[in-house]
Amino acid sequence: MIALRVHNTRVVSRSLTVWTRPSPTLTLSRSLATESDALDKPKTRRRKTVFTDALNSGPSFDDFVSGKASEIMDPLEAARKDPNQRLPSWLKVPIPKGKSYHNVKKDVRELKLATVCEEAKCPNIGECWGGKKSEATATIMLLGDTCTRGCRFCSVKTNRNPAKPDPMEPENTAEAISRWGLGYVVLTTVDRDDLADGGAHHLAETVMKIKQKAPQILVEVLGGDFRGDLDMATVLAKSGLDVYAHNLETVEALTPFVRDRRATYRQSLSVLQRAKETKSSLVTKTSLMLGLGETDEQILQTLKDLREINCDVVTFGQYMRPTKRHMKVVEYVTPEKFDYWRDTALEMGFLYVASGPLVRSSYKAGEAFIENVIRKRRHNVGEAPRLAQEIQPKIFRE
């Protein structure tokens, strides 16, 4: 009973404290408690009003009555029409179509071949695959569709341990090319650091089989750096190919930030140099992407470095970000600037220069000018068109 009375007294006392004017001491302690509670209590966030905001920013009832509603453009539509919000007009291309395009695509699927045209999302696929039979070009990617390196600009899949090379790939590739009747074919490859030879003998065997089935076709191989193993570059240079290509991709200062750490600027130069030293009649070729933040001085120095090793062909193209996971575009270079670099490179003595926003390493590979130069060089050095028969089988067994 005593405990009950005390409890009741406390209840009454508390109720009196609430409803009577508090003393100064109680007011101070209560105000401090209120401030502490406010700090601990999470702030109430304002509810999102996306729909309401969009409705309020749109045309009003008066706009509809006066007929001005049609003049108020939707923000998305405005972005489509604003060149600053979208890709520049010179980077837009038509949708691929045509009989030649679909024939090439069908054979690629049937023979289970990979093409860099598709893997790298090349914007010129419609023009290259859809060209006339003698002018069409295709870039077949050998040694699988998965690379052991991870360059920040490239959309090709990466893996430390990709699948083993398909032993039937050289034969299937040669068969596809003989079907298409191409005048010029480009073979490219992923980097295969997991293979002892970097895939050099596999590439060389593919070139040999193509030349056996269709000796009239000119073959360009866009190879890797073989981790700096120049003996493997020699194997590829002796395979019977017509154009030996290896891309620098960018200027020396940006190479560590753009390419995989295993690829270096000087290493790439040494590969091109070894190819030319192995066979002087070979056309050597490289490509540079612009729009990565390079300076004019850096580009000019790169061209000088290439001329010192007698590189014949250089191409310039705009870097275009494949996905949001890749490095951003620093600048969209204008067509006029590409023309400037074409003229500059030609004045420096390059045999041929392709320069434009949509130019890629294998773009316009079938230019009649390059074909004529290759055939003239072949004639001058007394080479027979049967290059495949001249290849020593031992280079594939080394």
UniProtKB/Swiss-Prot annotation:
One Pfam entry name: LIAS_N
Cofactors named for this entry: [4Fe-4S] cluster
Cellular localization per UniProt: Mitochondrion
Family annotation (CDD domains): Radical_SAM
Residues the record lists as binding [4Fe-4S] cluster 2: 147, 151, 154
Binding-site list for [4Fe-4S] cluster 1: 117, 122, 128, 362
Cellular component GO terms held in the UniProt record: mitochondrion
InterPro entries according to UniProt: Aldolase_TIM, Elp3/MiaA/NifB-like_rSAM, LIAS_N, Lipoyl_synth, rSAM
Pathway(s): Protein modification; protein lipoylation via endogenous pathway; protein N(6)-(lipoyl)lysine from octanoyl-[acyl-carrier-protein]: step 2/2
Domain Radical SAM core: 132-351
Predominant location: mitochondrion
Cofactor note: Binds 2 [4Fe-4S] clusters per subunit. One cluster is coordinated with 3 cysteines and an exchangeable S-adenosyl-L-methionine.
Keywords: 4Fe-4S, Iron, Iron-sulfur, Metal-binding, Mitochondrion, S-adenosyl-L-methionine, Transferase, Transit peptide
GO MF annotation, one: lipoate synthase activity
UniProt cross-references to SMART domains, sorted A to Z: Elp3
UniProt family annotation: Belongs to the radical SAM superfamily. Lipoyl synthase family.
UniProt name for this protein: Lipoyl synthase, mitochondrial
